[in-house]
Amino acid sequence: IAPLVSTADIAVCHLEAPIAPPGQEAMVEPQRISSAASITNALAFAGFDRCSTASNHSVDRGAAGVDATVAAFEAAGMGQSGVARTEAERLPALMTVNGVKVAHLAYSYGFDGTPLPAGEPWRANIIDPASIIADARAERALGAEVVVVSLHWGASMASNPTADQQRVAEAVTASGDVNLI
């Protein structure tokens, strides 16, 4: 896919699984998954610029998995949105694409019952229209001209949006601060 992906002005992917912490193996268990750090190098090689990392599996490996995920993207020279090592890192850096400053934000519907690390609600972004709008406004205050939001949501095996998805999308786009979901 590299010839196709690398021609895009900006190429964004989604990584469903967090990266396994150093010294731990990638895993696939019922309800808990993680990937090897080498996947970020493969995504960079394919031409992706950044990935959304907010998913129902974002905190499957706890804070160590979040830290490993951010570090793996940094090592691959890629950006990511959706998880953070620190509260200050929660809002991603702006990208400049053909002279336009672009923000990419990412959120998940939840974490399948896995709690966020105690006292660290900023570790992974959860879908909340007011928070999304506030984050988009913060990115605009930093100079973003375009704000793109990736939402990890939906009902399994459903081809139509739920009423809640429609409500969230309408609220977020009506704000005027988000250009694209």
Language-model-derived ranges and their functions:
Residues 1-181:
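Acidic, metal/ion-coordinating pockets
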